[in-house]
């Protein structure tokens, strides 16, 4: 049997038109096929609405399974109970709401991750500069602490200046005391030990001191002879004594320069 069914609403009448082709075994003699009436023929069509062998999809099968049909005397079809199907639909709606909320949370997390990963190079460089500045501040603090320790152990600046002036003065005296008529050159103090340098310096100073004593003795004899014989006036004797003092001052200056000078080879 083939037919067309139309359900207009719950509690509304259903118009059913069907064209039946029955075999002679199913239909009595003398009965010809034709359109079905609304009264008694609807009872024969109701089982076909709930028939288990109809070719229907899952949704329509579920609808037929959970729907209870009843017919009143006027031929109207009622569907009084859709409780189980409606409760299942409510559960499905709740599940869909939960799925939507979880999907929205996942989507927000994905957007945050994508925004953080796809940030502009300017923002990334700013973050890099901030991290570098933080690291440099930490390193600067450690370096300042080390500088405080080393500064407490180092020589003050005034002592460094004095040592620099002493070195400069020694170089100046060495250049001025070098003899220009001889091809001599100074030897680095570090190339000779301190004892050898002291011996050489003391020997040169002793030779200069001996020459000074010899010359001073000559002037002393001349002054004594002048006073004994009386050939010279007191003013002339005073001039000779003044010259003697000048010569002694020159010898003292030479010896002092030698003490400041370096060794000679």
Swiss-Prot record:
GO MF terms held by the record: ATP binding
UniProt superkingdom: Eukaryota
Start and end residues of each stretch annotated as Disordered: 21-53, 78-133
Residues binding ATP, per UniProt: 137-144
Compositional bias of kind Low complexity: 114-123
Keywords noted in UniProt: ATP-binding, Nucleotide-binding
Composition bias, Acidic residues: 90-101
Keyword ATP-binding: yes
Annotated protein name in UniProt: Uncharacterized protein YIR016W
Species this protein is from: Saccharomyces cerevisiae (strain ATCC 204508 / S288c) (Baker's yeast)
